[in-house]
Design a protein with these regions (language model features):
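Polytopic transmembrane helical bundles with strong interfacial aromatic enrichment
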Residues: 1-295
């Protein structure tokens, strides 16, 4: 394979992996939001004695939604295998190790998904399922940045570097609190599923307050990255992040004051994924060994 062809394929397969790892979060959320979490009431079978839905299941159309999401896991797995094999045959050791993680993570997700079903959609397992996906998305951003030659020789000023780390940590806190809020709210995935024994109003307020802190930090990062010539690339990413935050905040408040309709909650999940991708892109340029970009 020619060098230019290899480079192009590397970009495409790593982008496909990022899209797949992000997309499965959204489809998984749709399963929950449509009350289809137990559409296939067992695992690995869809219904006792059959890997696929069968006519006459009491779960009705929910079985097709849940089974469809399970089937998408094989697509995500196939893409992660292709990414790893390509890296193994063509790339340096460091990217080979990182490219192995989406493959392992996808397999773990399948098992965790099974545990989630077998525990009756307990919110703790649903939350773990989502947070593992968030980790895989961050890893996928890092891998794509490598294949996309997303590098810079500039070293961030210390104040910008520290600010990026703080924004990353607070952004992660926003995501975690968002999942706890979800685990305390009405969209459990099935009418019999348990919920966290928390006051939804209190946890939602805490989530909203953390979001306000996060947006304030993003505005601060916009300012300091703008006035530092060495961090213009940070300014561009932060500007995108700020726009996403505004849209995400608007959706968040509208959904709350309209009784959390599943369509708006789905859009909020998409916004959360896009927010996290932008945060992960910022983190690539920090001095943190785990987060920073590969060379």
């Amino acid at each position: 394979m020619k060098t230019t062809t290899k480079a192009k394929f590397g970009r495409r397969i790593s982008l496909a992996n990022l899209i797949a790892q992000s997309g499965i979060i959204v489809t998984g959320a749709i399963v929950r939001l449509t009350g289809s979490g137990l559409g296939c009431p067992t695992w690995p079978d869809c219904t006792p004695g059959s890997l696929i839905p069968v006519a006459g299941q009491v779960e009705g159309f929910h079985k097709y939604i849940e089974f469809g999401n399970r089937t998408l896991t094989f697509l995500v797995l196939a893409i992660s295998i292709a990414l790893f094999v390509f890296s193994l045959l063509n790339e340096k050791r460091n990217i080979i190790v990182w490219s192995f993680l989406p493959l392992i993570g996808t397999l773990l997700q399948a098992v965790l998904g099974g545990i989630t079903v077998l525990t009756g959609l307990h919110p703790a397992t649903v939350m773990a399922h989502f947070l593992l996906s968030i980790v895989l998305v961050a890893i996928s951003v890092k891998i794509y940045a490598y294949f996309n030659n997303q590098r810079t020789s500039k070293v961030l000023p210390k104040i910008v570097d520290n600010y990026v780390k703080i924004v990353t940590l607070v952004g992660l806190a926003v995501i975690v609190l968002g999942t706890i809020t979800t685990g305390s709210g009405p969209h459990s995935g099935d009418e019999i599923a348990a919920r966290f024994n928390l006051d939804i109003r209190v946890i939602a307020w805490l989530h909203a307050d953390t979001v306000l802190l996060f947006v304030g930090l993003v505005v601060g990062l916009l300012v300091i990255s703008r006035i530092n010539p060495e961090s213009k690339h940070i300014y561009k990413i932060t500007r995108t992040l700020f726009i996403i935050c505004l849209v995400q905040g608007f959706i968040g408040y509208v959904q709350w004051f309209n009784g959390l309709p599943w369509i708006l909650v789905s859009l909020h999940v998409i916004g959360a994924v896009l927010t996290w991708i932008a945060i992960a892109n910022l983190a690539l340029y920090s001095s943190n060994t785990f987060l920073k970009r590969l060379k």
